[in-house]
Amino acid sequence: MIISVDHGNKSIKTPNALFTSGLIVSEGLQGFKTDYICWNNKYYTLTEQRIAYLRDKTEDERFYVLTLFAIAKELERRKVPETLDPIDITLLVGLPPAHYEQLHSRFEQYFLRRREIVDFEYNGKYYSIRVSKVLSYPQAFAAAVTQFGTLKAHSVAYIIDIGGCTIDVLKLRSGHPDLAVVESFEKGVITLYNGIASKCNALYARILEDCDIDEVIRNQPTVLPGEVQQLIRTMTNDFLTEFYNFLRERGVDVSTSKCVFAGGGSLLLRGMIERGNKVAFPIFIEDIHANARGYELLYQSEVAANGQQ
């Protein structure tokens, strides 16, 4: 069985599921009606409080457990019955393009776990799985693959994947990667959230959550006072300006380039990017699951090329 998982610092995506990269661990069930997994005699529940940024997600077990949630949600979606007979899984994952060479082997082994059988309970159902193969792909390019039919018409374009803690930038020529520009800028929207929350607390003694900031950026109804809203908009514009300057220093001028934006951060910031009028030709990949679906397309292409089943 093929299962594709996009591990974001802000959220986990499969082709069919989306949830925050946050976990609570306990010795027993919490008593609240929420998704849970029991594995290795511990109970894990999902929370909207995301995990602090990890450049290397193999540092501890949390992203492994989040992957068990992703696998379980895909099994449930596909109506796979609970079973104690191991389900063999080929797991497709991704990494920021600039980190790929350094981290991909460790990342793959983290999930492979010597192909051991893993038994767990998910929301009262019992599953047994064995991750028999792990294949990793570059994020951003995977998202671009889902739009290859459109992108191949552009002689040069830049895919910009704005995530929780990284912004990945990849140059494309007729839809194919040009390794002359491969950047991972470690300043995604989580750093924006943290900066806004810190300054708002210092100036106005108000504690903000990510969702409070999202409401203002998206121009949604909010209970926040005007000065806080203005602070959020100003700091978000400064965040985008700093990023555009970062790109310009690396030879990418957003005022003259075709820029294809992907990722949840891009969808959050879309209105401000468009209203800012600094990006001449913005194209937005609106599917937040694009990377996960792109991993599947890349895998299918490899299988077809190798004549495998």
Q: PLM ranges: what are they?
A:
Residues 1-157, 176-191, 211-309:
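Nucleotide/phosphate-binding catalytic cleft detector across ATP-hydrolyzing
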Residues 169-174:
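PRPP/pyrophosphate-binding module of the type I phosphoribosyltransferase fold
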Residues 162-168:
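Ser/Thr-glycine-rich phosphate-binding loops at phosphate-binding pockets of nucleotides
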Residues 200-203:
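Acidic, metal/cofactor-coordinating or nucleic-acid-engaging core segments within structured domains
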